[in-house]
Amino acid sequence: MCQILLAILAIFLPPIAVLLDVGCNCDLLINILLTCLGIIPGIIHAWYIILCKEKTVVQNIYVQTNDHGTAPPAYSPYSA
């Protein structure tokens, strides 16, 4: 979502702006607690999250193996 719109939304509803920006994580919980302490700390934290904090990129890596070789030797307690 556009950072400018989120920054404006953060003035009125800081936790909602943080939720839309980063999802449900510890930043949202911190913002809710700061907003309960006072609207100004909540707004400042929301602006920091929206405008300054680097976004993490999640990249899923899928590994497919095709093991069609010979099977390893079976364990035998007796020597051959």
Curated annotation (Swiss-Prot):
Chain segments annotated as transmembrane: 4-24, 32-52
Q: How does it sit in the membrane?
A: Multi-pass membrane protein
Q: Which GO terms describe its cellular component?
A: membrane
- Where is the protein localized? Membrane
What are the entry keywords?
Answer: Membrane, Transmembrane, Transmembrane helix
Q: Which Pfam families match?
A: Pmp3
Regarding protein family, the annotation reads: Belongs to the UPF0057 (PMP3) family.
Q: What is this protein called?
A: UPF0057 membrane protein ZK632.10
Task: Provide the species name.
Answer: Caenorhabditis elegans
